[in-house]
Amino acid sequence: MQIRTYQVDGYTPGVDYPIYNTVPFGLAFTCGGKLPGYYADPEARCQVWHWCLPNGRQFSFLCPNGTVFSQTTRVCDWWFKVDCQDSPRLYGNNDELYRDVNGNKI
C-alpha cells in the first residue's frame, strides 16, 4: 500500500503538520464528562477527532493528510487554517448541536 503525502511549499510533512495513516494507538482523550459531539485531539495534532455519543461511547477518526479537525467548524480543514492548540477551549461549541433555531435546548 502506498501512502501519499502532500507537500506544501516551505513546510515539511510530519514536522509542520501531521501525516498519520491510522489513528495512533494509546491517545489519552476520553469522552468521560464531555457533551456528546465532535472533538479535535491536540495530542494527535488535531489530525484525529473523536465522536462522543450521549452514552459516553467514543469513535475516533482521522482527517486526510494535509488537513486537521477544526473545532470551530467541526470539519477537517487545511492544517494552516486551524489553531489546534486552541481546540480544547472550543469544546463547548458542541452545545450548539443540541439547540433549536431559537437557541432552546432540545
Language-model features: where?
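Extracellular secretome segments
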Residues: 1-106
